[in-house]
Regions:
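Glycine-centered hinge/linker elements that transmit conformational signals in sensory
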Residues: 107, 133, 140-172, 193-207
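C-terminal capping/gating helix-and-loop segments adjacent to ligand/active sites or protein-protein/ligand interfaces
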Residues: 278-358
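Short, solvent-exposed loop/beta-turn-alpha elements that line the ligand-binding surface or hinge
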Residues: 34-52, 95-98, 135-154, 209-212, ...
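Loop/turn elements at helix/coil->beta-strand transitions in domains of secreted/extracellular proteins
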Residues: 6-10, 34, 67-68, 112-117, ...
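Extracytoplasmic/periplasmic solute-binding protein
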Residues: 61-82, 101-148, 171-183
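Extracytoplasmic/periplasmic substrate-recognition and gating elements
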Residues: 195-272, 312
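Conserved N-terminal structural module of periplasmic/extracytoplasmic solute-binding proteins
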Residues: 1-25, 330, 339-359
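Hinge/lid segment of periplasmic solute-binding proteins
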Residues: 15-79, 199-207
Length: 359
């Protein structure tokens, strides 16, 4: 309410916005935030922010209708990790891009082979795939949704069956994939080193989505209030947050060794500063893994790095949190637990989404 009334702080973080009932993109459309490109253009500081120093794929996620409303600070790739010994026999010698169409087939092959095997360790992970399907069909900025297409209904049916077929005793499950999709860099290489140590090969897959593309989430971003009288000062703060030293220290590029018990959180997020990004990967290549006993091989170091380097699609973390929990959360649970049928679910989904978008 304070933000919408033109009050509040000069600088707002994405973490603060994720706690609000109004979506971040709705606030963007209502003119709450400044166009940061205008602030940069109007700045007379000779050392002002140079966007070329940062990852353009990630920075461009802050652009809506040609205007830059936020600057990403850190990000995480969405990665599902497995190994050749676990997964290759289900992949027909091809590494698939996971979509809503093929994930059910892959899961079924795994379940049929061994009743204790599953794609993920928790049934909650299958629910998250279902929620992602819904989110991909809701544009909070344009305030539009599409729940009427045959493709959407087909995916709803398929992912509901995927969820139902994996409601089992989680204590005995042997997961084929790391489940949450978010792996900090050192932990990713630690797991890959462990796979190498077993004379196995890593397999990296995307988290399932409509087009099967590799994706990432922006974990921290900074907005500037449109009503701020201190826009240049706010820009200086963004420059500081994106500086090589701050980004390298925060993201773990300067750690001396990787010890998960003492270095927890180092490298949890990836920097958008290009120099810091390079330093982080250089450090990840240099340190030892598996309790400080093993280096990562050059081939698998580059395998993971190339995957992260080539991610083109990013979105703000937490963008749909309120919508998923407070707006549609209970009807999703009812549908997945067979309390309501598909027609009633989609009818209610449309009604609630429309009300939320028009508020």
């Amino acid at each position: 309410t304070e933000l919408m009334a033109g009050k509040g702080p000069d600088i707002i973080t994405s973490g603060e916005l994720s706690l609000l009932s109004s979506s971040t993109e709705k606030l963007i459309k209502q003119g709450v935030f400044a166009n940061i490109d205008d602030i940069i253009s109007n700045s007379e500081d000779k050392d002002k922010l140079k966007l070329s120093d940062y990852n353009s794929n990630i920075l461009d996620a802050g652009i809506y209708d040609g205007k830059r409303y936020f600057i990403p600070v850190t990000f995480e790739p969405q990665i599902l990790l497995s190994s050749s010994s676990k997964l290759s026999k289900y992949l027909d010698n091809e590494q698939p891009n996971l979509t809503y169409d093929n994930i059910k087939e892959l899961s079924g092959s795994i379940n049929n082979d061994d009743n204790n095997q599953a794609l993920f360790s928790s049934v909650e992970d299958y629910k998250n795939v279902f929620l992602n399907l819904i989110n991909e069909n809701v544009d909070l900025y344009s305030q539009e949704y599409d729940f009427d297409s045959d493709d959407f209904r087909k995916s709803v049916t398929s992912l509901k069956e995927l969820y139902s077929s994996n409601e089992k005793n989680e204590d005995n499950i042997v997961p084929m994939l790391s489940s949450n999709g978010q792996l900090e860099l050192f932990a990713l290489y630690d797991e890959i080193a462990d796979i190498e140590n077993d004379n196995d090969e890593p397999i990296i897959l995307n988290t399932p989505n409509k087009d099967g593309e590799s994706t990432g989430v922006i974990t921290d971003a900074i907005f500037i209030s449109n009503n701020s009288d201190n826009k240049e000062k706010a820009l200086e703060f963004i420059e500081y947050a994106l500086s090589e030293k701050v980004q390298s220290d925060f993201c773990g590029a300067n750690i001396e060794e990787y010890l998960p018990t003492t270095s927890y959180g180092s490298g949890w997020e990836y920097p958008v500063n290009n120099e810091s990004y390079s330093k982080l990967f250089d450090k990840a290549k240099e340190v030892k893994y598996i309790n400080n006993t093993a280096n990562i091989s050059e081939a698998n170091f580059m395998y993971a790095k190339d995957y992260v380097d080539n991610i083109k699609s990013y979105r703000l973390y937490g963008l749909y949190n309120y919508y998923n929990t407070e707006v549609i959360g209970d009807i999703v649970d009812k549908f997945l637990s067979d309390e309501i049928d598909e027609n009633k679910f989609i009818k209610e989904l449309k009604s609630r989404t429309e009300i939320y978008l028009e508020e």
